[in-house]
Amino acid sequence: DVASLVLAMLAFRLQKVHPNSRYTYGYKKSTILVSLLNAVILLVAVGIIIAESIDKLFHPVSVDGSAIAWTAGVGVVINALTAWLFMKDKDKDLNVKGAYLHMAADALVSVGVVASGIIITYTGWSIIDPIIGLGIAVVIIVSTWGLLHDSLRLSLDGVPVGIDAQKIQQIIMEQPGVENCHHLHIWALSTTETALTAHIVIDNITQLEEVKQHIKEALEEAGIHHAT
């Protein structure tokens, strides 16, 4: 979890580094790479949880339910509070979503451990521990799948979620003076910035700057702040 938060913070810092002759867009895409890495790490963690849970199903181990419940209870509070800090912006930035899911997943695991600890304390059913573990693994997989899908999409320069390429082309075509729009490309510079390039034919070259300004203003309203 600490590594996940450090990676997210590092990506935020790199995103603000100015472009140079070798990296003409700067290091903005580091936020996408980190969100993808966080998704992969979460899935690896799920694999470990599943493997350990299956092993416990076939090789039950007696545990002190009371001790693990109290210990995990502390984890619930810490992880839940940390996840809450990221909750507000998790739908606006994949990098934030990755960090949020890490902390939320840990909070969920801790809740599961507390629940199994209490049940074991009062019933002695040690088998409940791996069963809850498998249930938690399923929940994490479902919640992480969207992060993995969106991160892969942005890594491959796909059109960001929430942006409709056909609608964007229509917006451009509706601007005064525009006759045609082709070779339209839309991709993510980072988890918060979207770029666009297009060949646009206008009916009067003397109005070039005016038409460009209208198009850029319309695109900014549509969530695209870097257009050429």
Residue ranges: model-predicted function:
Residues 4-228:
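Alpha-helical transmembrane segments and adjacent TM-loop junctions that form the membrane-embedded core
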